Swiss-Prot record:
Glycans are attached at N41, N89, N224, N279, N445, N489, N531. One of its GO terms (molecular function) is glycosaminoglycan binding. Residues 1-22 form the signal peptide. This is Arylsulfatase. Its cofactor is Ca(2+). The lineage of its organism: Eukaryota, Viridiplantae, Chlorophyta, core chlorophytes, Chlorophyceae. It comes from Volvox carteri (Green alga). GO terms for biological process: phenol-containing compound metabolic process. Induction: By sulfur deprivation. Ca(2+) binds at D34, D35, C72, D324, N325. It catalyses: an aryl sulfate + H2O = a phenol + sulfate + H(+).
Length: 649
């Protein structure tokens, strides 16, 4: 009798644990690199085999995923806040129009993804690069929203072999002779173990610096000056001889290396010299160094997946891989860098695996839905079971098109729009400088806007770029993916006028108008897509829409300088939408997964916490080798270090 009772109790206990696990919300692990392109083959399985083994093959790649402000700090803010830079007004790497002080003064960390997730019962973790000028001078002013944040601090952020971190605002430590990505991997594994032991769902973001350029900053007592030096990325010692036969991919469909004829480009690009053979040889080595620096990131992926697997949480975890912005090497007339409106700088990798996502099992099938960094936060919230809250946060993004790869177990209320976004805008304020060919002078007037239209069936793909000088470029991306032939004055008026109208709306969009600009252009509802807009009966209307114009070139956002006929219309629509949302009854249900995964039940019950919470965090082995940052560095004037902010981005 006693034996039967014990068996019965065991079965009941197992059933309870199974039910609790079935209702536990998913975890998220995001591996977020720095300056990794989505075009020049940096994620090829030859160079990142573990990325494919652990994320691409068990998941999917979004092949049309873009950033909209191609420089690190504004782009990271787009990711966490779900808003375009013209709505965050965080537009630069450093102050006064960017930088950590402005980021805090804008209150961005009062309402962004980690805070929202904590409000849902998640623990949140961060390790690696946060923002460029999070430094030895301001580390105590910790960004809100993180259960545990172990962030790189300047001047050690881009020092591959001497990284420095501050954990939760503590005095920074450095790790002399230890490779930055390896230190981040050790710390990330410890954070994940801590997160699992806490027994709550978690979001962990891991942000290595590769393949960003290396930066050395030090004070020269003889010259009584701070000196900053920029170099190509530095691989881990064990990876220096990898990929010695790799070359810049001239065989891609873009074919825009060392563009000879730039007569149709803006004046500042026409003034750039064509790279000579010695420069090209150097750029080839820069390309190889970027690939080699990513080899340690690939090893990091392997360690993270092994940790999740050993902890038994891999199957309930979304594992995501992406980057803060794209990067070009040798394209057009450029050496190496970012911040242009061309696709090399805008397109980034985005790979994801997790509950409900059908495995691709190869590199060939891919998701063709357009995705942007502003879509990231609403996607995470929706997958976390809080899709009903997305509309409350004034976001410009919408959940990614993961429904196209539903294996039958994706959330039942995951949005499945009839018309997924097929147009978006890009924007940048500031200058341009070449990050490796330092003999090329810096150009200060590189502010620009762009609009890109993409037909999922690949029948049409267009891009319009407007420089702050009001010079215009238009490319047919279906026939010219390398953006070599500017056809602004050659294409038919119907295409040109529709693109101009879309740009005029999207550069000032807020909320719904960012995903559906047609509602602003055609409030009566007669047009809901690019193809519908091309009907000849609308030719006269579009011919009379005033194109977007700059009054002058400025390195920052000024609404009076950026002239759009739709600014007041968009603002009124956004205000009306906010007022309507405020009148809606509050929906604050906490959604949980059922064992089938397809259905959701509304409940206020606590998150399953099968393991007993662990009070002390796991400590990474590498911590034994850390030493305090020298006192003279802690007392130095950080502002003097930033003499080339674009190279630091």
């Amino acid at each position: 009798m006693l034996q039967r009772l014990v068996v019965a109790l065991c079965l009941l206990g197992f059933a309870a644990l199974t039910a609790a696990a079935a209702h536990q919300r998913p975890n998220f692990v995001v591996i977020f690199t720095d300056d990794q392109d989505g075009i020049q083959n940096s994620t090829h399985p030859r160079y990142q085999p573990k990325l494919h083994e652990h994320i691409r093959y068990p998941g999917i790649e979004l092949k049309n995923y873009f950033v909209t402000t191609p420089v690190c700090c504004p782009s990271r803010t787009n990711l966490w806040r779900g808003q375009f830079s013209h709505n965050t007004n965080f537009t630069d790497v450093l102050g006064p129009h960017g930088g950590y002080a402005k980021w805090k003064s804008l209150g961005i960390d009062k309402s962004y993804l980690p805070v929202w997730l904590q409000n849902l019962g998640y623990n949140t973790y961060y390790v690696g690069k946060f923002l460029v000028d999070y430094s030895v001078s301001n580390y105590q002013n910790v960004p809100a929203g993180w259960t545990d944040i172990d962030a790189l601090v300047t001047p050690y952020t881009f020092d591959y072999n001497n990284p420095g971190f501050s954990r939760n605002g503590a005095t920074p430590n450095i790790y002399p002779g230890f490779y930055s990505t390896d230190v981040i991997a050790d710390k990330a594994v410890a954070q994940i173990k801590t997160a699992v032991a806490a027994g709550k769902p978690f979001y962990a973001q891991i942000s290595p610096i590769a393949p960003h350029t290396s930066t050395q900053i030090y004070f020269d007592p003889v010259a009584n000056a701070t000196k900053t030096f920029f170099y190509p990325p530095i691989p881990a010692p064990r990876h220096w001889e990898l990929f010695s036969d790799a070359t810049l991919p001239e065989g891609t469909s873009h074919k825009n290396l060392y563009e000879a004829d730039v007569s149709d480009k803006p004046a500042w690009i026409r003034a750039l010299p064509l790279a000579q053979q010695n420069n090209r040889t150097y750029l080839e080595e820069v390309y190889r160094l970027r690939l080699r620096s990513l080899a340690s990131v690939d090893e990091l992926i392997d360690r993270v997946v092994a940790t999740l697997q050993e902890a038994g949480v891999l199957d309930n975890t979304y594992l995501i891989y992406s980057a803060d912005n794209g990067y070009h090497v040798g394209t057009h007339r450029f050496g190496a860098g970012k911040v242009t409106a061309y696709d090399e700088d805008l397109r980034v990798p985005f790979l994801i695996r997790g509950p409900g996502i059908r495995a691709s099992h190869s590199d060939k099938p891919a998701n063709s839905k357009v995705g942007l960094h502003v879509d990231f936060a609403p996607t995470i919230l929706t997958l976390a079971g809080a899709g009903d809250q997305v509309g409350d946060k004034a976001l410009d993004g919408t959940p990614l098109g993961l429904y196209a790869n539903d294996d039958g177990n994706l959330l039942a209320d995951y949005p499945r729009p009839a018309n997924h976004r097929n147009q978006f805008q890009g924007e940048f304020w500031g200058g341009w400088s070449d990050e490796v060919l330092h003999h090329i002078p810096r150009y200060t007037n590189n502010s620009w806007k762009a609009v890109r239209v993409y037909d999922e069936d690949n029948q049409q793909a267009w891009k319009l770029i407007v420089s702050c000088t009001n010079e215009r470029e238009l490319y047919d991306l279906k026939t010219d993916p390398g953006e070599l032939c500017n056809i602004y004055n050659k294409t038919r008026a119907a295409v040109r006028t529709r693109l101009e109208a879309l740009l005029a709306v999207l550069v000032v969009c807020k909320g719904e108008s960012c995903t559906n600009p047609w509602k602003i252009l055609h409030p009566e509802g007669s047009v809901n897509s690019w193809n519908q807009s091309l009907d000849r009966k609308y030719d006269k209307y579009y011919a009379n829409v005033a194109p977007f114009q700059y009054r002058t070139c400025l390195p920052y956002q000024d609404h009076n300088n950026e002239v759009s006929a739709f600014r007041s219309t968009v603002a009124a629509a956004a205000a009306a939408a906010a007022a309507a949302a405020a009148q809606q009854p509050g929906r604050r249900r906490m959604y949980t997964w059922t064992s089938a995964g397809r259905q959701l039940s509304a409940t206020a019950s606590a998150i399953a916490t099968s393991p007993q919470p662990r009070s002390e965090p796991f400590v990474a082995e590498v911590e034994r080798h850390s030493v305090p940052v020298p006192a003279e560095v802690l007392q130095s004037d950080v502002a003097k270090w930033f003499d080339n902010p674009l190279a630091l981005a």
